[in-house]
Amino acid sequence: MEEFKGYLQKGGFKQQHFLYPLLFQEYIYVLAHDHGLNVNASTFNEPSEISGYDNKSSLLLVKRLITRIYQQNSLIHSVNDSNQNIFVGHNKNFYYQMISEGFAIVVEIPFSLRLVSSFKEKKEIPKSQNLRSIHSIFPFLEDKFAHLNYVSDILIPYPVHLEILVQILQCWIQDVPSLHLLRFLFHQYHNGNNCITPKKSSYGFSKDNPRLYRFLYNSYVVEYESIFVFLRKSSSYLRSTSFGTLLERTYFYGKMKNIGVTHSNNFQKTLWLFKDPFMHYVRYQGKSIMASKGTHLLMKKWKSYFVNLWQCHFHFWSQPSRIHINQFSHFSFYFLGYLSSVPRNRSSVTTQMLENSFLIETVTKKFETMVSIIPMIGSLSKAKFCNLSGNPISKPVWADLSDLDIIDRFGRICRNLSHYYSGSSKKQSLYRIKYILRLSCARTLARKHKSTVRAFLQRLGSEFLEEFFMEEEKVLSLILPRTSYPLHKLYRAPIWYLDIIRINDLVNNL
């Protein structure tokens, strides 16, 4: 049982005493329990050398804002200089927004310090920038997924009750005042809607406080994935105890004693039912993929585990339809802008031995990635580059720019998409996207000069098209001539780049 203690034992870096007792003192408790504060829209001056370069990162500013809300109606400021009083005209909601931004900055400090200290412990900092690339996951999928049988397409569910988020943070934060402040911010922004949802109320929260919202969402995902890893490692024990009680980690060691009694008798019986060494899990944003070499029954058991996990630990009902189990040979899943699949390719070889001939059939599986053209056309349509049918249209909002700026903007978008979709196994969809952007650029320029597209293209010549080629494509076109079949095949092979740290906006909107 020692390996389980290693998992659930709280690490020293997770138990943080933040700066709130020193910074905010008793004000947080008052704020968390007094929701009837009525503050006039007053402001104060703070020198730029104190407030910082953007007037948003100053802890002193946050403390003064809390003091101002707490001492309601005690200070009345007259506005004499609008340049000095930069906060004039803001109401109480502005104070709460500034406080939440300061909260997000302070709560990230221990994690940043831990990252720096981990680098200082090592003499040489590992070159991990390549692992940060989004494309770095696809070589892993190519190597592993071709040998697996089933895949589960999982949408990480929501909403999450706000009190559950506070309980999750209790594992990391020991400051009671900071938790009071967090509860107060939740109540202020959601006005009684105690869930993080995709509705308008949560949208305003994530839009006004993106830093705090990302921190809370990542905390929820870390908790969910840490329990998943625990279930994965201890899957052979789950048969011997109640699944729901195993999720609650408060009295875990006491429960493990009960598991140890039945463990010796049931271990050999349950190990083969649950142990799966060929299981892989990847996630990006709110979507995750779990693939296994096991049977369909095993994947259904994991689906049941996930549903019970969200219901028992996070206290909300998750629809089982959010987890789709499919066989790799009959399913294509959409992940990171690519439509991925593992098709079976059959090939027949005739062999002859003496007077007898034999027909040997072989089945090979290969991980393939393609550009899903229909969602991509929908994204281009929302950006006003084409209509819903995929026909290029002009972009009037850019017609007032200079010709070089228009060509540069279209060319940059085209090159970025080509760069991101360079790993596609089939390039036809990528060529169509390039065609839409090129013709949309030509229509925009023709609209600006009140000319026809044909006349404008004849005047620009071939230089217009060169702006839409990537530098890598220019080099490959010189080194690998398309007339040679082997080189042509190499030219069309997937290329993964290790310098892409974010998804293109057009791809991310799919």
Swiss-Prot record:
Classification via InterPro entries: Domain_X, Maturase_MatK, Maturase_MatK_N
Superkingdom per UniProt: Eukaryota
Sorted UniProt keywords: Chloroplast, mRNA processing, Plastid, RNA-binding, tRNA processing
Keyword rRNA-binding recorded: no
Primary location: plastid
Cellular component GO terms, alphabetical: chloroplast
Subcellular location(s) of the protein: Plastid, Chloroplast
tRNA processing is among the record's keywords: yes
Its job: Usually encoded in the trnK tRNA gene intron. Probably assists in splicing its own and other chloroplast group II introns.
HAMAP family given in the database record: MatK
Similarity comment: family membership: Belongs to the intron maturase 2 family. MatK subfamily.
Protein name according to UniProt: Maturase K
Gene expressing this chain: matK
